[in-house]
Amino acid sequence: MDVAVVGRLVTVYGVAVAVAAFIAAALSDLWGPRRVMVLGATVWIVLELLFLGLALTTDTGWLIVLTYGLRGFGYPLFAYGFLVWISAVAPPEDRATGVGWFYVAFSAGLPTLGALVATVSLSVLDLTFYGTLWISLGLVVLGSLTALVGVRERRGRRPLVDNPGDVLATVTRGLRLLRDDRRARYVTYIRTINSVPTYAMAVYFPAHVTGTLHWPLGRFLILTTVIYAVNLPFNPFYGRLGDRLGWARTMFWAGAVACAVTLALLYAAPLAGRSLGLPDGLVFGVTLVCGALFGVSLAGYVPLSAIAVSLDPGHPGAAMSTYNLGVGAAVAVGPLLVAVLHPLIGATGLTVVMVGLYLVAAVLCLALRGTQPGFDGVPAADAPASAAPDGATGPGTRSAASSPTP
């Protein structure tokens, strides 16, 4: 399949991820995060079995799209249900740090271990792509059992709100928050931009690496592994830094601005090196360094989830739904940008667009100042939502003093 076709297929998957990521938070308020995680693991495993055992073996096009797409409902329910769980039980002053540790595990799994397993399976064990997918399913089962059996915290095993019987109000609270508080929308936009390049690069960068740079596909997998392996320790680091120096300030400099600069370097450095006739090994080494810097910069967005919860601390699931929507939207928007723009402007144009998006995110980060107690003139005892941006009086305008903290 060419780049545009892959982009369309992954976009279908991404739409499912976006929907599931949003409802994972609302359902966590309603049912409790652990039940949402069980549902997510079940959906993924069952649909992956259908995808591998039936759709691919019969080469049925519509069934491949259906099972691959619906499978996208699984992992957000599991992963972001767990993120809501952490956000609900972490003390406010350490919330960004707790989220940072979540992303240590997330980055160690999906992009890092995933790329490493693919490298070993394809290059060392000489398995096919199909065989590698079966190995990935085994890892999903193992990881699901580890989380569901190993985590014993009690609050996440029950609804996070006091009135779970009011199903409609609980499920739609996140939507009302998006409607009434523009900062909630900014959270969604920033979180989408944070991950759009990584999902887009997964679609168009392999062809760029093999076709333009004339490197083997294994080098793309190594680059991906380096980006997310280096990212790991900086997730809790930037979480702690945000808790101590300011969430919005950390995101602006360490996240948005740094991502714009390092993504540009990651794309331009190998092209410049080859045009100058530098040794291939040196060019690849410089590319890995740029990739590592990009991985560090991606961690600069960790404090964003703490900002999301601060907008409605009495309903952490609803508040996190605005953040999770951005996570899921990135899975769809990234490949969609590739499908639409790659035929028109190529890899270079796409990269310029994504650098521009990071600069837009930097501007939006400035609008989130004043959401952290103890910073930007907000008293430490007060909630960040004392002044509603849209003149709203609904969710997102409550103060921590009048709302139970998670």
Q: What are these language model-derived features?
A:
Residues 30-41, 244-257:
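Cytoplasmic membrane-interface "Motif A"-like loop-to-helix N-cap segments
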Residues 1-4, 203-219:
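Short amphipathic helix-loop junctions that connect adjacent transmembrane helices
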Residues 153-188, 391:
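Juxtamembrane intracellular "pre-TM" segments in multi-pass secondary transporters
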Residues 67-106:
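Cytoplasmic helix-loop-helix junction between adjacent transmembrane helices
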Residues 77-90, 298-312:
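Intracellular juxtamembrane helix-capping segments at the cytosolic ends
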Residues 42-58, 258-279:
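C-terminal ends and interior cores of transmembrane alpha-helices
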Residues 100-115, 326-334:
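Glycine-rich segments within core transmembrane alpha-helices of 12-TM secondary carriers
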Residues 21-32, 234-247, 342:
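Helix-to-loop junctions at the C-terminal end of transmembrane segments
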